[in-house]
C-alpha cells in the first residue's frame, strides 16, 4: 500500500495480474470461513520431529521418496506439521477446512479461493511429483490425513481468481 499511496508513477490500470511468492513451507490451517486457526508453522519449526518419523515409518522412506521426490523432515515439509496438529491439537484439526502454505493464505485474502501451486505442494509430503501431480491418496491413507483438507492444486502460472480484497480494490487495483 505504501508504494501505491506514494504514487511512484504507477498506472494501476496497467497491472494485469498479481504474482504470489512466499516462504515455503509455512503451514496454515484454515477454518470454514477462511480464518487462520493457528499461527503458521514455519520451515524452521522442529516440533514435528516425532511426526516425521511416523510418516517415514508408515510409508517407508524409499516409497515416500519414490512418490514425492522428498523425505519427511520436521518443519521443512508441512506434512509433519499437519500430523502434529492432528495429534496435538485435535480440535483444530477437526475445524480445519483446508491446510495450505502462506501463499494459500495470500491467495485466499485476495481472491476468496483456496489453492496451492505444485511447487508448494511438493513440500507437503502428500503430493505425487512422480505420479501425476496430484495429492497422494496412498500416503494420506497411510498417515491418516484427510485428503479433503488439502487445497485445490494449480500450476504456478494459473489464475487463482479475480480480486475481491476491498483494500486492494480501494487502492485502484482491479
Residue ranges and their predicted role:
Residues 32-36, 54, 58-59, 64:
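Hydrophobic or amphipathic alpha-helical targeting/insertion segments
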Residues 45:
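Carbohydrate-associated surface elements
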Residues 39, 51, 55, 109:
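Residues that scaffold the ATP/ADP-binding catalytic core of kinase and kinase-like folds
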Residues 41-42, 120:
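Residue-level structural signal for beta-strand termini and adjacent loop
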Residues 2, 50-54, 84, 105:
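Generic beta-strand or strand-like secondary-structure segments
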Amino acid at each position: 500500500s505504501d508504494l501505491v499511496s506514494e504514487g511512484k508513477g504507477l498506472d494501476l490500470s496497467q497491472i494485469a495480474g498479481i504474482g504470489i511468492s512466499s516462504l515455503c513451507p509455512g503451514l496454515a490451517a484454515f477454518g470454514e470461513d477462511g480464518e487462520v486457526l493457528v499461527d503458521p508453522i514455519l520451515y524452521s519449526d522442529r516440533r514435528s520431529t516425532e511426526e516425521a518419523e511416523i510418516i517415514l515409518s508408515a510409508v517407508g522412506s524409499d516409497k515416500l521418496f519414490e512418490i514425492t521426490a522428498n523425505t519427511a523432515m520436521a518443519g521443512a515439509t508441512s506434512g509433519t506439521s499437519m500430523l502434529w496438529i492432528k495429534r496435538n491439537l485435535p480440535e483444530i484439526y477437526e475445524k480445519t477446512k483446508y491446510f495450505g502454505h502462506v501463499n494459500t493464505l495470500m491467495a485466499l485474502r485476495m481472491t476468496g479461493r483456496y489453492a496451492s501451486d505444485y511447487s508448494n505442494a511438493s513440500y507437503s509430503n502428500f503430493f505425487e511429483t512422480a505420479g501425476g501431480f496430484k495429492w497422494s491418496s496412498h500416503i494420506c491413507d497411510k498417515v491418516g490425513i484427510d485428503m479433503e483438507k488439502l487445497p485445490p492444486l494449480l500450476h504456478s502460472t494459473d489464475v487463482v481468481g479475480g480480486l475481491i480484497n476491498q483494500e486492494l480494490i480501494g487502492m485502484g487495483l482491479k
